[in-house]
UniProtKB/Swiss-Prot annotation:
GO terms for cellular component: cytoplasm. HAMAP family: FliW. Acts as an anti-CsrA protein, binds CsrA and prevents it from repressing translation of its target genes, one of which is flagellin. Binds to flagellin and participates in the assembly of the flagellum. It is found in: Cytoplasm. The lineage of its organism: Bacteria, Bacillati, Bacillota, Clostridia, Eubacteriales. Interacts with translational regulator CsrA and flagellin(s). Its main location: cytoplasm. Gene3D superfamilies: BH3618-like (2.30.290.10). This is Flagellar assembly factor FliW. It comes from the Bacteria. Keywords: Bacterial flagellum biogenesis, Chaperone, Cytoplasm, Translation regulation. One of its GO terms (biological process) is regulation of translation. It comes from Clostridium botulinum (strain 657 / Type Ba4). The keyword Cytoplasm applies.
Length: 143
């Protein structure tokens, strides 16, 4: 199958690549089917893209690229919804807010996207804690 994206050109994917989000994601509750693909010539960022709306693609990254000790505790209901049997089946991604000023690029560490890579289902959760920021700087200033 082929997805013609607004910013990333034509992307080939297969049905097995599609990740289903029963509730959509905050702000896009009506969109349930997404794929993930790499940003060209970039090892840090991925694109989390709707296959139902060619204009909706979000840059994401692994939180472990930003915070090596990143840790979240899923509630029992979230584990059940995601059908997670083993934590190694969970892929954790966080949304990135881009800016032309590299120092203003931020990562939302408080609302991770959790994907069961075995079952191909996902959910974006909100962490009810001040431990992580919604606008965490991607690049920290050197002291």
């Amino acid at each position: 199958m082929k997805l013609n994206t607004k910013y990333h050109g034509s992307i080939e994917y297969e049905e097995r690549d599609v990740i289903y989000f029963e509730k959509g994601i905050p702000g896009f509750e009506e969109l349930n089917k997404f794929i993930i693909f790499p940003v060209e010539d970039n090892e840090v960022f991925l694109v989390f893209h709707s296959i139902e709306n060619e204009d909706i693609g979000i840059i994401v990254t692994s939180p472990f690229n930003i915070e090596k000790d990143y840790e979240i505790q899923l509630e029992e209901e979230q584990i059940t919804n995601l059908k997670l049997q083993d934590e190694k089946d969970a892929l954790v991604l966080n949304t990135v807010t881009l800016d032309s000023d590299i120092d203003k690029i931020t990562v939302n560490l408080r609302a991770p996207i959790i994907i069961n890579i075995k079952e191909k289902i996902g959910e974006q959760i909100i962490i009810n804690s001040d431990k992580y920021k919604v606008k965490h700087p991607l690049f920290k200033e050197e002291a």
